[in-house]
Amino acid sequence: MLVSGCNDESISLESDIISFGSNTANAVGPILKVIESEYGINEVFLTTVHGYSNSNRLADVAGAGFRKNRAAGENIIPSITNSSKVIESALPMLKDKIASFSMTVPVPDGSTIDLTLNLKTKTSKDEVNSYLEKVIKDNSLKNIIGFTYDPIVSSDVVGNSLSGLIDGLSTMCIDEDKLKLIIWFDNGWGYASRIIAVSYTHLTLPTIAGV
């Protein structure tokens, strides 16, 4: 399982089929990786607030899966997500530490992740924001994850090619070890942009390897 910014080194010349996770996993996985590296993580609670898609219903219908068959343009719909398993596959050090949940909301695009962490190391809101700004700017995440203090809303990330955009205004910290982050993402375009980038990398591997 590949998640950009988490385990890119897993791509090889022998990779005939690449499983690319989910848009949620790609939005939050790289952030969890750098936080785990700097502070250590005990537990993660992850809620994706997701725009509806063509797998949702536009009108209430009868059938199995009562919630999923409700009108997506009129309801906030709780649903399950496998993003925790995808992230744990890409970041084995977080295995059995992540609980994930999803809510589909009546917007066609533009989604967000409410990320709550119990850290191993004490910190503060300002320290975490400064660290995330620096690490995103200085390493290979700069074209994958972004950071902003702009007071944005969901429609502002429509068409954004980043996997995720951290909302610095919304960062919270309690008791120096309980952290909340908000991450915005275009649930279609950001994910598609990573697929294109990874596909290009895979295609150029023979050149890089001198084959």
Feature annotation, model-predicted:
Residues 105, 184-191:
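Glycine-rich phosphate/pyrophosphate-binding beta-alpha loops
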Residues 129-131, 194-198:
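Composition- and surface-driven signal marking solvent-exposed, interaction-prone regions
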Residues 201-207:
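Conserved small/polar residues in nucleotide/adenosyl-binding loops
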Residues 40-179:
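C-terminal substrate-binding/catalytic lobe of Rossmann-fold NAD(P)-dependent oxidoreductases
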Residues 26, 122-123, 189-190:
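A generic structural signal for alpha-helix starts
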Residues 23, 79, 120, 186-187:
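Structured loop/turn residues at secondary-structure junctions
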Residues 1-69, 173, 195-197:
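N-terminal Rossmann-like NAD(P) cofactor-binding subdomain of oxidoreductases
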